């Protein structure tokens, strides 16, 4: 049997999960190569952090590589030295919220396990892909790899500096990318800090500053001034909406539906989080039922509210935010930046508050936490620039990532499918909508794995149970 090769470009969680699913479902005769410059896989933006203040945002029992593995990581983590060394991971309701690096290491361990036990030949090439033409992937070191199928598992480009801050680029008080290792080490304990953005990245930053005993005033601002909600404490049965009834085809209609469902749940003494969780589980189907115009309306009007309710934070982190707000150390504003200048080591920001008033800030550090620049994804590395420049791939109409079809195949500039070039993970969310949370990313990786095996006409075996241990 001739060897066939699938090349996965990007070895964060998405690419590593895809490789594991291929190893589980594939058979002898298949080579899977993950191109990722980091020494270990599954160490992307989310799970590559080494800061112990950064915790998984949901209980460990909900972290898995496949839907039928609920509780496996939780079991393994509780038996690990990491759990014994981190008593704060155990919340009072009995759930555990590990440091995020623990999950990344666990996923990497699964990859290593399948390298040793799967009939599929798995390999990790520590390099970066810079071009893909005529079925050949070229790497930064000059290697050329023949690929029958290529998957782009490139999810999170670096943050983009807001236009008003670009003249300050390079100023020691401007922290443009808080994801960089030791980026916050330069914040002195008494520094006054401004944080632009109030989502998950901001929550990580505040938790990190708290861990390093920062005591200066922190001003957090975003246009709507909304913080991520805390995750649900306790154990509840799933709440299920009735999808058998006629469904709305508009963003406004779904907003009304969700509000009604939340009221009904409250009448049963059930928390609103259960309603949002069911919407999330069915989010891809709902998203694809909306027209492009309605999807655009959702992103413009409702996305900020969806994000703070959908992407919730660990209770340990929520507790830090609440305590700092109560003490007056942290102040949250609904505002936008209208001017910025430097005066030596001091940075002066002018904000426009939601009511129209101006507000001046003088700080020592400005930290940008507006998240990945997904609208600039195709310009974020050499490979994507080449593919885009050649007309092989194009951005999706919503500027969320890369345009794909229902099979996750990329579409060229003429709207035609590239049968040998796929996207896995969040970069495909323009098509699928709900594709940022780990359960959905893992499910998408499993779906793409089966698409790849079917496209290569390879037999697909029933997924073998993994040895899901460290």
Locations of the language-model features?
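Flavin (primarily FAD) cofactor-binding/catalytic cores of flavoenzymes
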Residues: 1-45, 88-246, 252, 256-456, ...
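N-terminal glycine-rich dinucleotide-binding loop that anchors FAD/FMN and/or NAD(P) in oxidoreductases
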Residues: 48-73, 236-252, 316
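Glycine-rich, highly charged phosphate/nucleotide-binding loops
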Residues: 76-77
């Amino acid at each position: 049997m001739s060897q066939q090769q699938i090349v996965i470009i990007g070895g964060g969680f998405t690419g590593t999960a895809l490789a594991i699913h291929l190893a589980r479902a594939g058979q002898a005769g298949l080579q899977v190569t993950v191109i990722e410059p980091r020494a270990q896989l599954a160490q992307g933006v989310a799970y590559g952090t080494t800061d112990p203040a950064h915790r998984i945002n949901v209980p460990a029992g909900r972290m898995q590589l496949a839907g039928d593995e609920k509780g496996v990581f939780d079991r393994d983590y509780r038996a690990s030295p990491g759990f014994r060394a981190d008593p704060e991971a155990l919340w009072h309701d009995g759930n555990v919220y590990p440091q995020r690096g623990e999950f990344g290491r666990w996923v990497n361990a699964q990859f290593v396990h399948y390298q040793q036990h799967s009939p599929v030949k798995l390999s990790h090439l520590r390099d970066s892909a810079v071009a893909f033409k005529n079925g050949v992937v070229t790497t930064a070191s000059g290697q050329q790899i023949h690929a029958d199928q290529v998957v782009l598992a490139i999810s999170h480009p670096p943050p983009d500096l807001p236009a008003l801050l670009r003249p300050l680029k390079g100023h020691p008080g401007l922290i443009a990318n808080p994801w960089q290792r030791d980026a916050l080490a330069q914040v002195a304990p008494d520094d006054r800090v401004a944080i632009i953005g109030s989502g998950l990245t901001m929550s990580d930053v505040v938790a990190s500053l708290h861990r390093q005993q920062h005591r200066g005033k922190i001003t957090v601002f975003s246009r709507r001034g909304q913080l991520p909600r805390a995750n649900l404490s306790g154990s509840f049965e799933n709440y299920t909406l009735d999808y058998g009834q006629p469904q709305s085809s508009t963003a406004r209609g779904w907003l009304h539906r969700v509000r009604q469902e939340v009221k009904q749940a409250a009448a049963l003494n059930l928390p609103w989080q259960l309603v949002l969780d069911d919407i999330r589980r069915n989010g891809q189907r709902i998203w694809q039922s909306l027209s492009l115009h309605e999807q655009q309306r959702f992103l413009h009007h409702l996305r900020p509210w969806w994000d703070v309710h959908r992407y919730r934070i660990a209770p340990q982190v929520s507790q830090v935010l609440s305590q700092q707000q109560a003490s007056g150390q942290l102040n949250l504003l609904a505002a936008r930046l209208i001017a910025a200048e430097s005066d030596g080591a001091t940075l002066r920001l002018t904000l426009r508050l939601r009511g129209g008033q101006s507000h001046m800030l003088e700080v020592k550090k400005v930290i940008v936490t507006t998240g990945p620049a997904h609208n600039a994804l195709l310009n974020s590395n050499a490979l994507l620039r080449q593919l885009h420049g050649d007309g092989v791939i194009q951005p999706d109409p919503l500027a969320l990532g890369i345009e794909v079809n229902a099979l996750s195949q990329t579409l060229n500039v003429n709207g035609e499918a590239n049968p040998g070039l796929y996207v896995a993970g969040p970069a495909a969310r323009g098509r699928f909508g709900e594709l940022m949370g780990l359960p959905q990313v893992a499910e998408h990786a499993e779906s793409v794995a089966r698409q790849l095996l079917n496209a290569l006409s390879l037999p697909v075996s029933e997924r073998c149970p993994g040895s899901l241990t460290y």
